[in-house]
């Protein structure tokens, strides 16, 4: 048996002040696709020199959130790998690469650097489980500078949504 006690529903948290410098609002990021996110992220990067996202290099959290938002996985129901012919995974990797090449997404080496990027203002957004709010609100000087929204969805995957999960706990 198990008892769930934590939720990992994915949120998009956006720095209002950084977006305003780019002529945008957090509402511009509501219910959007990844191609729109890339377009807006380029605008933010160009006008503020701030990337939209920071991720920890070598982790697959963002890819997994993308997959789950489209009802896909790297595993089949029988537990075997679902990689070679996984069209949604291919698209997720392409999006990640586009974000990275455009400077909209930057990689850091570890969790401490990831949290430091969020708390120092060197990233304009965070896409992660809602549990990340604790790390966001720990930076008291940024109080009132964040807005919560949902995550982007795939442009061309049937059934793709702006919702996913990253984590959760049980005992």
Identify the function of each model-found stretch:
Residues 111, 128-133, 152, 167-168:
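Beta->alpha turn/N-cap motifs
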Residues 22, 98-102, 139-171:
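Extracytoplasmic/periplasmic substrate-recognition and gating elements
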Residues 1-6, 10, 20, 35-81, ...:
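Extracytoplasmic/periplasmic solute-binding protein
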Residues 124-129, 147-149:
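Paired acidic/hydrophobic, glycine-rich loop segments that form the ligand-binding mouth/hinge
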Residues 40-41, 96, 114-119, 123, ...:
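Short, hydrophobic alpha-helical packing/hinge segments within bilobed ligand-binding/sensory domains
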Residues 17-29, 102-104:
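Aromatic-glycine-rich donor-binding/catalytic loop that engages nucleotide-sugar donors
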């Amino acid at each position: 048996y198990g008892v769930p006690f934590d939720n990992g529903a994915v949120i998009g948290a956006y720095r209002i002040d950084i977006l305003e410098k780019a002529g945008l609002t957090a509402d511009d990021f509501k219910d959007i696709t990844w191609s729109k996110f890339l377009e807006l992220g380029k605008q933010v990067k160009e006008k503020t020199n701030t990337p939209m996202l920071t991720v920890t290099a070598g982790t697959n959290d963002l890819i997994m959130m993308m997959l789950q938002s489209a009802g896909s996985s790297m595993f089949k129901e029988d537990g075997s790998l679902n990689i070679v012919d996984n069209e949604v995974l291919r698209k997720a990797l392409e999006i990640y690469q586009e974000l990275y090449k455009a400077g909209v997404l930057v990689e850091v080496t570890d969790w401490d650097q990831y949290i430091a990027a969020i708390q120092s203002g060197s990233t304009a957004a965070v896409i992660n489980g809602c549990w990340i709010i604790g790390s966001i609100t720990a930076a008291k000087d940024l109080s009132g500078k964040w807005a919560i929204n949902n995550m982007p969805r795939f442009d061309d995957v049937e059934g793709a949504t702006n919702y996913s999960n990253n984590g959760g706990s049980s005992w």
